[in-house]
Amino acid sequence: MEFIDVIKSRKSIRSFINKEIDQDKLEYICNCARLAPSWMNKQCWHFIVIKNSEKINAIAKASIINRWLKKVPVIIVACADPLSSGKKNGIDYSNVDVAIAFENMILASTDIGLGTCWIGGFDHDKVKKILEIPPRIKIIAMTPLGYPMNKENIIEKSKKIIIRNTKRRSLREIIHNDIW
C-alpha cells in the first residue's frame, strides 16, 4: 500500500473478529514504534501489549465508555517515562515523543490490515493499577488491536450519528506561507 493510502484508510475501529494476531505482526508493529524519532533520541516510550483476557476485561470495566473493549483480542497501552525524556523551557517532550511512536504503530497496523482506535478517555489511575505501572510513568493513550469486523455494528452506527463530520479541511484552510 502507498503511504498516502495507509493514512487515508486509517480509521477508528471498535469491532473486531475473534482472531488471534500473529506474533510476527505484533513485533512488526512494535518495531515501527521503536524506530520513531524523539527529542534528543531519548526514546522515553514503553508499550504494554495485553493479550490476557482478564486484564482486557479489567481495563474495559475501568471506564463505562470503554466497555466495548472487553471483546478485543489485544490492547496496547502507550506510556512515557518523563525522567527519560527531555525538558526545555518548561516543556516536557515525553507526550509528543510517545505520540509520534504510537502513531507509527497505528499506521503500521493499518498497513498490515489490522484495526486500531486511539483512546485517551479512560481512568488512568485504574489502568495503571491493573497493569502495575510504576508511579512516575504516564499513560499517554491506548488502542485495541485486531482484525476489523466487516459488518457495521451498533457502536459504529452510533458513532456516525454522534460524529457526523468526517470531512478533512483543505490545505488552503490549514497551511500558511511565510506568515499567518
Language-model segment annotations:
Residues 1-180:
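Acidic, surface-exposed loops and disordered segments
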